[in-house]
Amino acid sequence: MGGFFGVASRTSCTLDLFFGIDYHSHLGTRRGGMAVYGDGGFRRAIHNIENSPFRTKFDRDLDELEGTMGIGCISDMDPQPLLVRSHLGSYAITTVGVIRNEDELIKEAYENGHVHFMEQSIGRINATELVAALIDQQESFKDGLLYAQKRIEGSMSILVLTKDGIYAARDRRGRTPVTIGKKEGAFCVSFENFAYLNQIGRAHV
């Protein structure tokens, strides 16, 4: 399992993002990650959190992860968020879920001209990279997310961070939650709502 959190703000999103992700720490014990977009473009950090909590691993990265929009995750599986450059532009992506027809989708990607995927231990492909490959088969992020949800058998909720904003897509059967919160000058999207309700000034949309 895992959880994700995203923030779009008129001012710095970094601390809200940091604490929002940290509130999901009970959902995963292997990897944590943050990606932000600011004046310098995209910045990202991923750490192993098997032997120490998210907060202590990422506290030292916060000065470098400065921006007004960001996404991040706690993951029990793959390292993420990923940074991607495609015909849609540069973006960051993080996911929560399971792809049951992974082998079929990978085979189709090769047949359609997708050159390669980065292989992980024991021959696994990062599921988030596969989702990005599906999105990139279409001509817009909206169409790409709809296409990915249509093709994936299983359950997959997705956050995509672009220079223009954050796209959030709940898995099409509603098995996993995606909730939206707000405070003055900022919106957030979260796997679990207490991640923003526990932060002062935030409420449901």
Question: Which residues fall in each region the model found?
Answer:
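Conserved short alpha-helical segments that host acidic/polar catalytic motifs at enzyme active sites
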Residues: M1-R202
